[in-house]
Amino acid sequence: MIQQETMLQVGDNTGAKKVLCVKVLGGSTRRYASVGDIIVASVKEASPGGVVKKGDLVKAVVVRTKKEIRRADGSYIAFSENAAVIIDDNNNPKGTRIFGPVARELREKNFMKIISLAPEVL
């Protein structure tokens, strides 16, 4: 469950390490984002020589949340950290690698490029 001012790890190789959620996209009263939702974020920590710099405003898709997600079969899945992957305007990842597992819910939201790059889909 991600809301405004939430800090997230970045799970790709764009150069950003941490981002801060500025806005949850999807309507003016939308408060929370879960796995597969798109947010607008500000880069708070970045490594030198990366694609994005500190202070950049980026679009990102949430790939892992500490808050558990209920699945249709009744099972739950939760991760040890909140993480996002930076995307472009066409919902394709800006980076060329994805680090760590991603949730299966991304497949239902048509983030196929992220699914194919991820080392593990849970």
Swiss-Prot record:
Keywords: Ribonucleoprotein, Ribosomal protein, RNA-binding, rRNA-binding. GO terms for cellular component: cytosolic large ribosomal subunit. The keyword Zinc does not apply. It comes from the Bacteria. GO terms for biological process: translation. Disulfide bonds: none annotated. It holds the Pfam family Ribosomal_L14. InterPro entries: Ribosomal_uL14, Ribosomal_uL14_bac-type, Ribosomal_uL14_CS, Ribosomal_uL14_sf. GO terms for molecular function: large ribosomal subunit rRNA binding; structural constituent of ribosome. Part of the 50S ribosomal subunit. Forms a cluster with proteins L3 and L19. In the 70S ribosome, L14 and L19 interact and together make contacts with the 16S rRNA in bridges B5 and B8. Belongs to the universal ribosomal protein uL14 family. Binds to 23S rRNA. Forms part of two intersubunit bridges in the 70S ribosome. This is Large ribosomal subunit protein uL14. It comes from Syntrophomonas wolfei subsp. wolfei (strain DSM 2245B / Goettingen). The gene is rplN.
